[in-house]
Amino acid sequence: MTKNYIFITGGVVSSLGKGIAAASLGAILKARNLNITIIKLDPYINVDPGTISPIQHGEVFVTEDGAETDLDLGHYERFIHTKMTFLNNFTTGGVYSQVLKKERRGDYLGATIQVIPHITNAIKERIILCSENSNIILVEIGGTVGDIESLPFLEAIRQMAVDIGRKNVIYIHLTLVPYIATAGEIKTKPTQHSVKQLLSIGIQPDILICRSEKTVPLHERKKIALFCNVPVDAVISLKDVNSIYKIPKLLKNQKLDDYICNYFKLNVPEADLQEWEEVIYAEKNFNNTIVIGIIGKYIKLPDAYKSVMEALKHAGFKNKIKVDIQLINSQEVENKNFQILKNLNGILIPGGFGDRGIVGKLLSIQYARENHIPYFGICLGMQIAIIEFAQNVVGIKEANSTEFDPQCKYPIIDLIKNRPNNSSKNYNKIENRINLGGTMRLGSQPCKLSANSLSRKLYNQEIIIERHRHRYEVNNLLFKKIEAAGLQVTGRSQKNNVVEIIELSNHPWFLACQFHPEFTSTPRDGHPLFIDFIKSAGKHKKNFI
């Protein structure tokens, strides 16, 4: 099977949306019956994003096999219907770690280890390894051309054209074409300079995708084509849109997929984008608008909750409801400032780590429980829902998590068993942590649902598979008293009986789960828990109008 590689680089500034562009292009090519995969190369020194603050990097997307990866992999999965694995994302730190381990073992037979060829060879090997079962491999290179961190990756993809043949490689450069409002003009000079930098590395882009506030007119595209040495048909205008789900159609309308298929000499059927038409239609046509509050501590960067926000939108599509998402800093609720919660039709508390903002989250859960507002807790959102119920309903004021208070007298949430340094008193001391990364319960795990429960009804099956990312879990030895007071466990892991789902029966909609259902939601299908949560929030609005 002939393998064709499409390398996507970025220029001028970061955060132009290379991940969305790669996912959208992948969706179009997948619709042409091509076997697609997408790889993200990240130029930072961290081995993976698992220990990076969400405020700096955005959410950590967990794959089925338990890899902690860049949030762009979430876009890839949602757009191309393909499950990503640990092979689909690697970093400079991961590559150097791999090379240094080999050097320590003596695999290089005493050679002097250098960026070229050892690091670049390792990068190429990882790319090729991930491409085994695909005939089109899209590779997104993080960062911006000109950054020193990206140089080994750029050199590696330059060499790929030499290794496998230039005819099997396309270089796409995504660049900014700014619109200067005071002059009323689009400026192409930054793009020209970015391409010049790319040429200095030895890479001639084949296609330019021009990100701009407005559509780049033909005469400007001709100018870019002339100065950047690409055909005018290969200069694609990608203007700002109000929905990322419009981008596949936007690229298709400019025949980007035709250009690529002709370049690779692929005789494949035209892309049918009907499913994307349906998504766009669902997004525009709704019968109701509701307000959902996400109570968190990383709200300075909305990307920290990217998959949760997308899953809420997907659920809105399925219910013909527009979801207005409000990101609320949990610390603002700590002084019982319930005024900011009054207009919410649903409250969601997502995953997180550490004790900052926990009081505000506990108060938000209490407010939702007592005022019959639909509540959805995810990961940490389940753990603190249990703590809130234990403290305020059961009356166990000492109930807490050892993550927040290692000395607590009633550790209803505690460290996962059988982990290194399992004592929470020791683990919470930084000097006693051998490695923080890779010490969690990660990836897809089976869960058994209780008969006659809401979760069983929504999933319509007894055994479900969902993705996890947590270091703490419910202490089964202390939970019986809480369960007897009315907080039902309706889902447990098959392997070790871990509490996975809780429900409160005397409430319109109160459900929380230890896993992360947002990672498997798609714009076409949504996710059963999110869909019913939004449905319930819609009912709440009608009841309180």
Curated annotation (Swiss-Prot):
One of its GO terms (cellular component) is cytosol. Residues 291-543 form the Glutamine amidotransferase type-1 domain. L-glutamine binds at G352, L380, G381, M382, Q383, E403, R471. InterPro entries: Class_I_gatase-like (IPR029062), CTP_synthase (IPR004468), CTP_synthase_N (IPR017456), GATASE (IPR017926), GATase1_CTP_Synthase (IPR033828), P-loop_NTPase (IPR027417). It is an enzyme of class 6 (ligase). It holds the Pfam family CTP_synth_N. One of its GO terms (molecular function) is CTP synthase activity. CTPSs have evolved a hybrid strategy for distinguishing between UTP and CTP. The overlapping regions of the product feedback inhibitory and substrate sites recognize a common feature in both compounds, the triphosphate moiety. To differentiate isosteric substrate and product pyrimidine rings, an additional pocket far from the expected kinase/ligase catalytic site, specifically recognizes the cytosine and ribose portions of the product inhibitor. Homotetramer. Catalyzes the ATP-dependent amination of UTP to CTP with either L-glutamine or ammonia as the source of nitrogen. Regulates intracellular CTP levels through interactions with the four ribonucleotide triphosphates. This is CTP synthase.
